[in-house]
A protein has these predicted regions:
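ATP-dependent helicase/translocase motor core
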Residues: 2-299, 308, 312-324, 343-344, ...
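Catalytic cores and motor modules of nucleic-acid processing enzymes
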Residues: 14, 42, 50, 268, ...
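Short basic/glycine-enriched coil/helix segment immediately N-terminal to the Walker B
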Residues: 125, 264-268, 341-344, 361-379, ...
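Signature of the SF2 helicase/ATPase Hel1-core->accessory helical subdomain module
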Residues: 142-145, 152, 184, 191-193, ...
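P-loop (Walker A) phosphate-binding loop of NTP-binding proteins
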Residues: 275, 305, 508
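Loop/turn-to-beta-strand initiation segments
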Residues: 299, 344-347, 377-380, 404-408, ...
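Inter-Walker segment of RecA-like/P-loop motor cores
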Residues: 319-361
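Conserved C-terminal RecA-like helicase domain
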Residues: 346, 476-630
């Protein structure tokens, strides 16, 4: 440990002392930890345990299941004493967490059979370790710090699963200036997949969303005894259906507190303005369930719109806490539950429509009369969306019938005076009551401006189509549909990162949607005839059919004003067109949908838009949707991380514009830098007005936060990054060429190259998705770094990164600090087009081409593979296989696949036989040992000892022999695992 690291630790302990934590320097090992826990347990439960009782108690509560441990921590539990009598006990004071003993310990060592780790700082509540704090001196890469903890937790028999550390709820990582925290979880929710997602990690913030990152301030705001107790007891959610711990974000916590305080003080109504994609359901759930134990109120109703199907929200609520919400199958059930005194009926999820029927005096069933005893009770109504079409009609009825009721609403896009009246249907004005009129005041704001700054949602890149000709259309007017389609076909691959993502085309009406669908088919067929290499887009279309008295469709259409209006004209024509569209969908995707069961078709379309994560494993590429044509559907409330582009051929304004744009800006990783908008109606002014209205912040220029930089600015940064890389190479007396990277001396130089080129590639990834680059700009980008040079640099980057990653894996904590903190971001170097299937088909084509007509020779194909991160473990094998293919022998794709599988199997057998011979081991036994590791994805030290047993070596000689074998075997295991984690291997390498 360096002095400065030690100083950070001592300063933190001193700060916690100021916060009235007790420092326990005597607790440094497992024995002392357990003795302290025993003393606290006996004092809390007013009991003295015998040694055998304590041992049985400890063994019964220690578990490798984080979720079960979290429940044990929060519940009253039972234990049988030596004399057979039951002991009901708690681990901490669950009624008043502030009254627990809070202690801080440091440099704890927990030694188990396979694990010898030291932990910087731990916080104990009543002797139970609940928070681990890892301190660093270097600039913390949160992903690297997380990776380290994940690695520790994957060691078989680690301290986290075999000791009291199983009760850890939170991990905190800090380098004094930058502090992050995240929830503990079981392995399936604690995995680290640098390609697609990271563990949910958080920075704390104040109520006005100012970040609290300094460790000293963080300790004061977050680790104060009562605050930490609340964070763990009130603001962590145990998701029953997924057996997962969920930490609420700071803005969610403040919103819940605001509602609870407002009810406690009985100070009227209020609304929560939290932007789309910010997790409103979790916030409203927590508010509702905390009110369940609030004696100030009699009932809490969580009200959704029928279109959202209360079943869906109920399932979401019950996902957070099993059985917490009962189903109201009809209005009669709702009324019965409202009148019930049962604790289970205190929180009720219902629909606006059922609530309206219950309060309708004209209803024959006299619901309103039966509810009369509740008239003066304290009722709380929480509305999941303030401005559903049905809301206004019921608001007045609720206020009149329940004069003591308090109403709370959630919205991502409030209605202000300015947007209270706007065009909802082409040619018609619609009016809304403002959110302030309905709910009096805003209790908490977390706007899109906040969310973009927090990287919880992405910025937007808006490309306004510039029509040409003598009389171009004015802003707000459409252009010819054929021109729109030609533009989409030209720009789609750029906008969607080579079809890694997909798009929605928003049209002005149902007739437009039908026309677009038919025109897409016609134009793409023509292009296919002209060019056999043309790859058509998979186009789907979805709009609601004429209702014809169908209640399900009527419900769907309640918030689809344009579709409702359009279906009044020529309903049979609309129905026939939708039937053709669904038939085309069935033929394309092998489904069997009918418009009579429209909702099933609609759900399938949504699933195909969402299932885009893997090149072929969730859905084959041919089974994915590229563009979905819509009118009103999917433009509000629909979320997919793999939707990144919106094509707009309809007039949008204010909240309608923000809702539609927000479909594209869900965060994935650096391969999705922003949401792409291609607007064919030149709506610059409506965009500027919406940004000004919904920024929610008194800032000079919110558009700089909401919108990405101009292409010219990013090109300037790209040029500067390449120039910086060139200067770096010159300083090392090397020319700035890919092959020169291999001549860099020392890991420090290699690390600098990795960081510099990673920035080059990040900027290039951004530019690659700009759809509005002028020809001169494209030329300039290629001049800065030619495509061939870029590909070669990518290849050398991957080779260098692979070498440094091996040091990272092998040496762990002992690796140099700058190597430890490296984050390679391989996702920037993986093309969605170039997957395994694509490579196999390219190799097949290569063998089938005549020598004079080669579009891609062997070395070019190898270069393409070696510049893609997906093949980092197999790149050498694929290159060797391609070079070994016979000349002038045409092979189909199946032959290529089978040949490559044989090639790999034979090479693996040869390599293992060579290793076995060098170490005097039986080749078949070594093969079985390796196959077992790969099958289970777990490295088991006992199996290694069994493999060595026939050599009859003493302990010391056997240990040396094992280390020598694993030195050779580990790189091969990593390669054969193809990037998948092998539990226990990283820690084994680290301990060598």
């Amino acid at each position: 440990m360096t002095t400065s690291e030690q100083q950070i630790e001592l300063d933190l302990i001193a700060k916690l002392g100021d916060l009235k934590y007790t420092y326990r320097p005597d607790i440094r090992d497992r024995t002392a930890l357990e003795a302290n826990f025993r003393a606290k347990f006996e004092a809390l439960n007013r009991v003295r345990l015998t040694d055998s009782e304590f041992q049985r108690l400890r063994d019964s509560i220690v578990t490798d299941d984080v979720y079960n441990a979290a429940q044990t921590l929060r519940n009253i539990n039972s234990f049988e004493r030596d004399d057979g009598t039951p002991l009901n006990y708690i681990l901490v004071n669950i009624r008043d967490w502030c009254k627990n003993d809070f202690e801080v310990i440091n440099q704890l060592r927990i030694n188990t059979e396979n694990s010898h780790h030291r932990y910087d700082v731990m916080l104990l509540i009543n002797g139970v370790p609940v928070v681990q704090i890892e301190l660093k001196t270097l600039a913390v890469s949160p992903r690297r710090a997380m990776q380290q903890i994940v690695d520790y937790k994957t060691v078989p028999g680690n301290g986290y699963s075999k000791t009291l550390l199983c009760f850890l709820q939170l991990f905190i990582v800090s380098n004094r200036t930058d502090t992050w925290y995240f929830a503990n979880n079981n392995a399936r929710h604690f995995s680290f997949n640098a390609d697609e997602r990271f563990l949910p990690i958080y920075q704390f913030a104040s109520e006005d969303n100012k970040k609290v990152t300094l460790l000293d301030s963080f300790a004061e705001k977050f680790l104060a005894k009562c605050t930490l107790g609340q964070m763990i007891s009130r603001y962590m959610v145990l998701v029953a259906s997924e057996q997962k711990l969920l930490m609420m974000r700071p803005y969610q916590i403040y919103a819940v507190k605001a509602i609870v305080d407002c009810i406690h003080q009985n100070c009227g109504n209020g609304y929560i303005w939290h932007t789309t994609g910010s997790g409103k359901t979790l916030t409203s759930f927590k508010a509702s369930t905390l009110l369940k134990d609030n004696p100030d109120i009699d009932k809490c109703l969580f009200v959704v719109d029928r279109k959202d199907l209360d079943r869906q929200t109920r399932e979401e609520f019950n996902r957070f806490q099993e059985g917490c919400v009962e189903e109201n199958t009809n209005t009669e059930t709702l009324v019965r539950r409202l009148l019930s005194d049962d604790y289970a009926d205190k929180v009720i999820v219902t629909t606006i429509q059922k609530l309206g029927l219950a309060l309708d005096g004209a209803n024959k069933r006299n619901y309103k009369e039966r509810l009369e005893p509740l008239r003066n009770q304290r009722m709380v109504f929480i509305f999941d969306e303030c401005h559903r079409s049905q809301f206004g009609d019921n608001h007045k009825a609720i206020k009149e019938f329940f004069p003591n009721a308090q109403l709370f609403g959630f919205t991502g896009t409030p209605i202000f005076e300015k947007n209270a009246s706007y065009q909802q249907i082409e040619g018609q004005q619609a009016s809304y009551r403002t959110t302030d009129d309905l709910f009096q005041r805003c209790l908490h704001q977390y706007t899109i401006t906040h969310a973009i700054e927090d990287r919880n949602v992405l910025r937007f890149h808006v490309d306004y189509f510039k029509p040409e000709g003598k009389n171009p259309p004015k802003p707000g007017e459409g252009v010819a549909k054929a021109k729109v389609i030609e533009t989409i076909l030209a720009k789609h691959d750029t906008a969607t990162n080579g079809r890694k993502f997909n798009a929605v085309l928003a049209t002005a009406g149902i007739n437009d949607a039908i026309e677009y669908f038919e025109l897409f088919a016609r134009i793409q067929n023509q292009k296919k005839e002209q060019d056999p290499e043309f790859r058509p887009l998979n186009v789907a279309c979805v709009f609601s059919p004429p209702a014809d008295g169908n209640k399900d469709v009527q419900q769907i259409q309640e918030d689809l004003p344009q579709e409702q209006e359009d279906n009044k004209k020529d309903p049979e024509g609309k129905k026939a067109a939708l039937t053709r569209i669904v038939a085309d969908y069935n033929a394309r995707f092998g489904t069997n949908h009918r418009i009579s069961e429209f909702d099933l078709y609609y759900q399938d379309v949504q699933k195909r838009i969402k299932d885009q994560q893997y090149p072929n494993t969730d859905l084959p590429a041919a089974q994915k949707i590229d563009v979905t044509i819509v009118v009103d559907m999917l433009l509000t409330g629909f979320d997919s991380k793999y939707l990144n582009t919106l094509y707009v051929d309809k007039n949008l304004k204010y909240h309608g514009l923000i809702q539609a744009f927000s479909r594209t800006n869900r965060v994935l990783n650096d391969s999705k830098p922003y949401g792409n908008i291609l607007d064919f109606r030149q709506q610059q002014n409506p965009v500027e007005e919406a940004i000004a209205l919904f920024s929610g912040e008194k800032i000079d220029n919110p558009r700089e936060i909401w919108l990405v930089e101009s292409a010219a600015e990013v090109i300037r940064k790209y040029e500067a990054a390449v120039a910086g890389m060139s200067r770096f190479m010159t300083d090392k007396n090397l020319i700035c060429e890919p092959e020169a990277v291999y001549n860099l001396k020392g890991d420090t130089a290699r690390i600098e190259f990795v960081n510099r080129f990673k920035e080059v590639q990040r900027l290039k990834t951004q530019l690659d998705q700009y759809t509005d680059l002028a020809p001169a700009q494209k030329e300039r980008i290629d001049t800065i770094l030619s495509p061939d040079q870029l590909q070669s640099f990518r290849s050398t980057y991957l080779e260098t990164a692979k070498r440094l990653k091996e040091i990272q894996s092998k040496e762990g904590d002992q690796a140099p600090p700058d190597v430890q903190q490296l984050d390679f971001e391989f996702v920037l170097f993986a093309s969605s087009v170039i997957d395994y299937d694509y490579i196999m088909s390219l190799i097949a084509k290569l063998t089938q081409q005549k020598p004079g007509k080669l579009t891609l020779n062997r070395e070019q194909l190898i270069g393409l593979i070696q510049s893609d991160a997906k093949f980092i473990e197999e790149r050498e094998d694929i290159a060797e296989y391609i070079r070994g293919l016979p000349v002038n022998e045409a092979l189909d794709e199946k032959q290529i696949r089978n040949g490559f599988d044989r090639f790999k199997a034979e090479k693996k057998t040869r390599e293992l036989t060579d290793i076995a011979n060098r170490h005097a081991l039986d080749a078949a036994a070594l093969q079985t040992f390796v196959d077992d590791i790969l099958r289970r994805r777990i490295f088991d030290g006992e199996h290694l000892s069994e493999l060595m047993a026939p050599l009859n070596l003493g302990w010391k000689a056997r240990t040396q022999k094992e280390l020598a074998l694993m030195d050779e075997l580990t790189p091969l295991l990593h390669k054969l695992a193809q990037g998948r984690e092998i539990a226990g291997l990283a820690a084994y390498e680290e301990g060598r």
